[in-house]
Amino acid sequence: MSIRDWPEAERPREKLLEQGAAALSDAELLAIFLRTGVTGCSAVELSRRLLSEFGGLRALLEADLASFCGHLGLGVAKYAQLQAVLEMGRRHLAERLRRDSILESPQAVRDYLKARLRHEQHEVFACLFLDTRHRVLAFEVLFQGSIDGASVYPRQVVKRTLAHNAAALILTHNHPSGDARPSLADRQLTARLKEALALIDVRVLDHFIIGDGEPLSLAEYGWL
């Protein structure tokens, strides 16, 4: 049965307009994005099938072009649309972050870092550079690969801090495994960077580790 034949209150688009996007299931949201199904399969049914094949919404959103287009109902045009939507979301979060001091919008910081790093398949280390009023100057990825004491160079972090004329930093890196708990190496690296930046009177406000859930704050655990 086509979605057009469903009761109006159950159609994804009408339901979104009536109740808001948060009221929709993953399959219903995806169905609105897809717009149409395939022969013998409504957009919602196709969405459920795709979510099952990918193993969930996150895997679908993070799929590369070849993987994405290897599924029925998906192609290059949809992939391009999806990447544009995801990038608009990241830019929206970045604008929110730049408007105010990060101390006034701590959740915006977490949301932004999640959007930037959660999809990465390999470890990525980045810095959020802040001015004297703790407003964002820049976000920059500095290192990629295995993030440990041997691969992250304090002198490079100091160099980029001076280039941005930053007064404070937020450090961040992701754990592709999804487990955000810090390793001993993570804590040692944080201490080394804090010490190096203190020499130029720059504060490290926090170090967030991005996993599957909410970003883990080393400062909140007293590890900074």
UniProtKB/Swiss-Prot annotation:
<dbReference type="Pfam" id="PF20582">
    <property type="entry name" value="UPF0758_N"/>
</dbReference>
<protein>
    <recommendedName>
        <fullName>UPF0758 protein PLES_57141</fullName>
    </recommendedName>
</protein>
<dbReference type="InterPro" id="IPR010994">
    <property type="entry name" value="RuvA_2-like"/>
</dbReference>
<dbReference type="InterPro" id="IPR020891">
    <property type="entry name" value="UPF0758_CS"/>
</dbReference>
<keyword id="KW-0479">Metal-binding</keyword>
<comment type="similarity">
    <text>Belongs to the UPF0758 family.</text>
</comment>
<dbReference type="GO" id="GO:0008237">
    <property type="term" value="F:metallopeptidase activity"/>
</dbReference>
<keyword id="KW-0862">Zinc</keyword>
<keyword id="KW-0482">Metalloprotease</keyword>
<keyword id="KW-0645">Protease</keyword>
<keyword id="KW-0378">Hydrolase</keyword>
<dbReference type="InterPro" id="IPR046778">
    <property type="entry name" value="UPF0758_N"/>
</dbReference>
<feature type="binding site">
    <location>
        <position position="173"/>
    </location>
    <ligand>
        <name>Zn(2+)</name>
    </ligand>
</feature>
<feature type="binding site">
    <location>
        <position position="186"/>
    </location>
    <ligand>
        <name>Zn(2+)</name>
    </ligand>
</feature>
<dbReference type="InterPro" id="IPR025657">
    <property type="entry name" value="RadC_JAB"/>
</dbReference>
<feature type="domain" description="MPN">
    <location>
        <begin position="102"/>
        <end position="224"/>
    </location>
</feature>
<dbReference type="InterPro" id="IPR037518">
    <property type="entry name" value="MPN"/>
</dbReference>
<dbReference type="GO" id="GO:0006508">
    <property type="term" value="P:proteolysis"/>
</dbReference>
<dbReference type="GO" id="GO:0046872">
    <property type="term" value="F:metal ion binding"/>
</dbReference>
<feature type="binding site">
    <location>
        <position position="175"/>
    </location>
    <ligand>
        <name>Zn(2+)</name>
    </ligand>
</feature>
<feature type="short sequence motif" description="JAMM motif">
    <location>
        <begin position="173"/>
        <end position="186"/>
    </location>
</feature>
<dbReference type="Pfam" id="PF04002">
    <property type="entry name" value="RadC"/>
</dbReference>
<dbReference type="InterPro" id="IPR001405">
    <property type="entry name" value="UPF0758"/>
</dbReference>
